[in-house]
Amino acid sequence: MDGDLNLDYSKPIYIIGDVHGCLETLCALIEKLPQKWDSQIIFTGDLIDRGAKSCEVVDLVMKYNYACVLGNHEELMLEYYHAIPSKGYNKIWINNGGYEAMESYQRNGGFEKIHEHLEWFLKLPRFLEIPLCDEKGQRLFVTHGFGLPYYKEKEKKAEMVTWSRLKSHNWEKEAKKNYGVFNVFGHDVRKVPMIMENFAAIDTGCVYVGDDSKSAVLSALEWPSKQIYQQDNCER
């Protein structure tokens, strides 16, 4: 469930998609939220890699004690630094944004800071289920990947919850099922948020500036209203 998040269910929750080291864009988006820095925020993971300020983004999330689920990029970094057993992905990290992350850490404390953040990553849950319901009585289910198909076996198949993509499932069929939860996730980059009856894909590729197939926008979904807040990439 919501663990030790100490959420106030009389106030909305804001779920923010994959940040990927885009610090200025994240700060600008938070400034657009009604309660700004006092907002109840949950991140879908992938705080790091590709963008220039991975270390700074993680520091910010830790400073404000915002909630976050484990993203596949955090898992790749954990494996690269041998904080978790190898699954054969360790060489993938560097070529998928890890190099930029390393540069960020070199500017901000080096291995001491890396160790601090790896310890924090190890404590991140793979999913959060929040008993704050929408108009249909659906609880909030936050994951990094498309977790809905694994909801009934989420403990047993927790790793799949992190890595799952829409294209691996019949999402139109999933959208018609009643799990009692509404799944908000990142991982699948889309030009605009995809909001269905029981899930929302909110990674709008904020780091991908110059790629016409992506919007280079950071998105947040307000729960339970499902209103979307967005910020164009504004990295300097």
Annotated model-derived regions:
Residues 2-9, 33-34, 58-61, 128-136, ...:
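A short acidic-Thr-Gly-centered motif at the start of a beta-strand
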Residues 1-58:
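N-terminal active-site segment of His-dependent metallophosphoesterases
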